[in-house]
Amino acid sequence: MKNPPALTRRHLLALAAAGLAAPALPAGAQGAGAWRRVPEIAGLLDGVEPKEGGIALDLPFVSENGNSVPLSVAVEGTGVRALHIFAPANPSPQVATFHFTPLSPAAVETRIRLNESQTVVALALLDDGTALIAEREVRVTVSGCLTDAGTYASDSLFQTRVRVPETLAAGAAGPVLTMIGHPMETGLRPGPDGAPLPQRLIERFEASLDGEPVFAADLYRSVSADPYLKFQIAPQASGTLALTWREDTGHVTDAEARIVVG
């Protein structure tokens, strides 16, 4: 199978010029090097020194509250084994891990929870054993979102939405947008009796085209309620896109969409 269209440096620079992406914080900038203080990142690197550059990481500079902060990230080139997102100042630093295939260029958007102002980190692990790192500082006006009841509101439990391009040229990438109604209960919010409410999370998302893996995501406590994902698909032929959302209780929700290549 052909590799997906590579995200080139030109593409990343174009995103940055449009205000849709930002490079890693320069050495000496406030918050720079935040990743070195995250044990989970050190464990993933296993002694490899990551390189700055090659990742376009975009979040707002200021968020009025941390309940739902938009995040987009794209990695230059191909051969991305996994893309990890961390919010080091959250109670659980790991936010999400994204997995790409030859059918999906390494670009994704979602919404995350930030419990306070901090530097968000993106770590890309590549097939050749190297790693890329990027950081973005975000100021949160109202902190403590992970214990705010409004963080968990969801009126449409397990209801899904999917949007795909009408048609795609063979091998050309196009966006898939999907979401599911779910409170993403973290286990940190106190209930009426003061005891923490039980954790209840959508922990895994998978997309496949006629049975062939396209894209997957591991989701953790810091993904916003009603999880939203926008990823890319670059099919060679028409087929049925199958989407699966898996809750940590074992409950599974499925959805489908037709991908037309012509």
Task: Report the location of each language-model feature.
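N-terminal secretory signal peptides and thylakoid transit peptides that target proteins
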Residues: 2-19
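Short amphipathic, basic-aromatic surface patches that mediate peripheral association
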Residues: 180-196
